[in-house]
C-alpha cells in the first residue's frame, strides 16, 4: 500500500488566500507565499493551490504568482484554476509544479483531458470533481465554475468518464462539507472507491486529525486533503497555519 499523503489546500482569490464555507462566505486568511514557507517548515507531504477567482471568472492562470509559489515550495505542488488548454498546463508544469488540477474542463471540453494526459503523462493530470447532494434525491450532482453552475451530471457517472479520459487522479470535493469541519462524506466516498481504479484524494469537511485517521484506516484512502483544519486553530477559528508533526502524523496510519 502506498503511504497516505496529508495535503493542505490553499484557495487563492486574486493575490490573497481565502477560506470558504460551502464555496461561499470567503474569509481572507493571509499571504500565499508566507503560507507556503510555513508548510515548508512543517514538512507537509504535498500542497494544493486552487485559484477560485480564475475558476469563477474564466480568467487565465496567474502565471507570475504560480511561478513564485513554485520557486518557494519545497514539497510537491499541485495547481488548479483557469487551466483550459495544453499550452497553459505545460507552462505551469515548466515552473516546477508537479501536477495540474482541472475541474470544469471535464464537462466543457473532456477531450482536452485526454490530450493533456497523452502529452504530459497521466500522473500530471488531476481532475477535481465538485459535488453536492441533489435536491429531493439520494444522488450527488456535479457542479462547475466553483460551484456556481449545475451540470445535471451525477458524480458516479463523471468519475467513470474521467477514468476513461486518462486522468491520473481524482479529487472528490464536497461542496456541502466545505469549511464545515464536521467530517468527510464517508458513504459516497465508499461508493466511489468501489468503481474507481485510479488514486482518489478526498477534500471537504475535515475538522480534526481523527477525521483524517478514520478516512485512512477505515477506507484506505491515500490522498487526504483539508483546508480549514490546516489554517484555523481553536473554536473561534483564529487564523494559524498548522500541520501535524511527525509523531502525530504517524498515529494516523495503520
From Swiss-Prot:
Locations listed in the record: Cytoplasm
Entry's Gene Ontology cellular component terms: cytoplasm
CDD domains in the record: HisF
Coiled-coil stretches: none
Enzyme class name: lyase
Molecular function per GO: imidazoleglycerol-phosphate synthase activity; lyase activity
Residues the record marks as active site: 130
Catalysis performed (reactions): 5-[(5-phospho-1-deoxy-D-ribulos-1-ylimino)methylamino]-1-(5-phospho-beta-D-ribosyl)imidazole-4-carboxamide + L-glutamine = D-erythro-1-(imidazol-4-yl)glycerol 3-phosphate + 5-amino-1-(5-phospho-beta-D-ribosyl)imidazole-4-carboxamide + L-glutamate + H(+)
Enzyme Commission number, as recorded: 4.3.2.10
GO biological process: L-histidine biosynthetic process
Quaternary data: Heterodimer of HisH and HisF.
PANTHER family, per database record: IMIDAZOLE GLYCEROL PHOSPHATE SYNTHASE HISHF (PTHR21235:SF2), IMIDAZOLE GLYCEROL PHOSPHATE SYNTHASE SUBUNIT HISF/H IGP SYNTHASE SUBUNIT HISF/H (PTHR21235)
Purpose: IGPS catalyzes the conversion of PRFAR and glutamine to IGP, AICAR and glutamate. The HisF subunit catalyzes the cyclization activity that produces IGP and AICAR from PRFAR using the ammonia provided by the HisH subunit.
Family per record: Belongs to the HisA/HisF family.
Name of the protein in question: Putative imidazole glycerol phosphate synthase subunit HisF
Organism: Leptospira borgpetersenii
